[in-house]
Regions:
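GNAT-family acyltransferases
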Residues: 1-56, 60-64, 81, 85-89, ...
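Amphipathic alpha-helical recognition patches that constitute DNA-binding helices
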Residues: 56, 73, 110
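Conserved acetyl-CoA pyrophosphate-binding loop and the N-cap/start of the following alpha-helix
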Residues: 65, 69-78
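Glycine-rich, flexible loop segments associated with nucleotide phosphate handling
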Residues: 105-111
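Conserved active-site tyrosine of GNAT-family acetyltransferases
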Residues: 115
């Protein structure tokens, strides 16, 4: 079955349990549900406010919504939010190392593909986290004319 083309992503601020917030927070450094075609397709957000000129993003796509461009659009929307708040930020992300036993970690590969397509890289090994060894990806600030368009935020 061919992958469907993703439509525009709308971000909806939410709390840690994915409950939509009644009002948008005063800063963008929060979590979001990603909506497309009238349904939740995934989500993402920031691990906290910027520190030392860097901010970290994380994102995901729900099963059944993968391979439709939602992950890339969500990550791109997070970049736009970060740079709209502070155009000098370097944005970082982490992905898992793929296992060496020949079994491919498809989530890590998909995420690496998204990050590469957005200009991140090259990845560097980072300290092991609670999920095991990870790669650290970085994207320095880009020229304003090359920054992604700001997403729609449901308020």
């Amino acid at each position: 079955m061919p992958a469907r083309r993703a439509t525009a992503i709308t971000l909806w601020p939410c709390d840690a349990q994915a409950r939509p917030l009644a009002a948008a927070p005063p800063t963008p450094w929060t979590r979001y549900l990603a909506w497309a075609d009238g349904q939740v397709v995934g989500g993402g957000g920031f691990t906290g406010p910027p520190r030392q000129g860097r901010v970290e993003i994380g994102y995901f796509t729900l099963p059944g919504q993968q391979r439709q461009g939602h992950g890339r659009r969500t990550a791109s929307a997070l970049l736009a939010l970060a740079w709209a708040a502070d155009a000098s930020l370097t944005v970082i992300a982490h992905t898992r190392h793929a296992p060496r036993q020949g079994r491919h970690n498809t989530d890590a590969a998909a995420s690496a593909h998204i990050l590469l397509s957005l200009g991140f890289g090259p990845p560097r090994p980072a300290r092991a986290s609670r999920v095991g060894p990870v790669w650290r990806w970085a994207l320095p600030p880009t020229r304003p004319d090359r920054q992604p368009q700001a997403p729609t935020i449901n308020r």
